[in-house]
Amino acid sequence: MAEKRNIFLVGPMGAGKSTIGRQLAQILGMEFIDTDAEIEQRAGADISWIFDVEGEEGFRKREERIINELTQKQGIVLSTGGGAIVSKDNRNYLSARGTVIYLETTVEKQFQRTQRDKKRPLLQNVEDPRQVLEDLAKVRNPLYEEVADIILPTDEQSAKLMANQIIDLIDNLKI
């Protein structure tokens, strides 16, 4: 990769965006930023608390402001929250300001990867988390596909291998 163009990772919770993003940034010598971590740092509170106090709408407003700001930086690998693409503005920011990689995974893999994670507000205090994941996938998967320059399944490979695959795919795109 000759120039350090922004790389934006989108996909559902549990797809591996943060893990793969860290690997990718390390290999490329780029800055890694996780939007959820950035939101928590700026708010001085975790995402579950923000959801409890401000609701999902309040959280999404914070997320949109941060994505608008961060996507204007140069040479970053940005891991977005699973619902970031619901916002048309976010989809526009991501598409216009970098290469968007959709890290695709199955609902079953998502469920396995998130079932013990207490930092997933949309999966807390629900009767059937798997059904929630299926419902989210129906709404969000077409939006991930819409915004993606590259779609990459993440179910069976290591983060380092996935990061190297992304580099190869971006090089082949000649973006």
UniProtKB/Swiss-Prot annotation:
Query: Which residue ranges does UniProt annotate as crossing the membrane?
Result: none
Quick one: where is this thing mainly located?
A: cytoplasm
| Record's cofactor remark | Binds 1 Mg(2+) ion per subunit.
Tell me where it resides.
Cytoplasm
Keyword Metal-binding in record:
yes
Reaction(s) the record says it catalyses: shikimate + ATP = 3-phosphoshikimate + ADP + H(+)
* Keyword Transferase among record annotations: yes
Signal peptide stretch: none
**Residues annotated as binding substrate:** 36, 60, 82, 140
Q: In which pathway does it act?
A: Metabolic intermediate biosynthesis; chorismate biosynthesis; chorismate from D-erythrose 4-phosphate and phosphoenolpyruvate: step 5/7
What biological-process GO terms show up in the record?
amino acid biosynthetic process; aromatic amino acid family biosynthetic process; chorismate biosynthetic process
Give binding positions for Mg(2+): 18
A Gene Ontology molecular function term for this protein is:
magnesium ion binding
Q: Which Pfam families does UniProt cross-reference here?
A: SKI
Q: Where does ATP bind?
A: 14-19, 120, 157
Q: Which UniProt keywords apply?
A: Amino-acid biosynthesis, Aromatic amino acid biosynthesis, ATP-binding, Cytoplasm, Kinase, Magnesium, Metal-binding, Nucleotide-binding, Transferase
Q: What is its EC number?
A: 2.7.1.71
Report the Gene3D superfamilies cross-referenced here.
Answer: P-loop containing nucleotide triphosphate hydrolases (3.40.50.300)
Sorted alphabetically, the Gene Ontology cellular component annotations on this record are: cytosol
Purpose? Catalyzes the specific phosphorylation of the 3-hydroxyl group of shikimic acid using ATP as a cosubstrate.
Q: How does it assemble?
A: Monomer.
Q: Which PANTHER family match?
A: SHIKIMATE KINASE, SHIKIMATE KINASE 1, CHLOROPLASTIC
Name used for this protein in its record: Shikimate kinase
Species, as recorded? Histophilus somni (strain 2336) (Haemophilus somnus)
Its ancestry begins with: Bacteria, Pseudomonadati, Pseudomonadota, Gammaproteobacteria, Pasteurellales
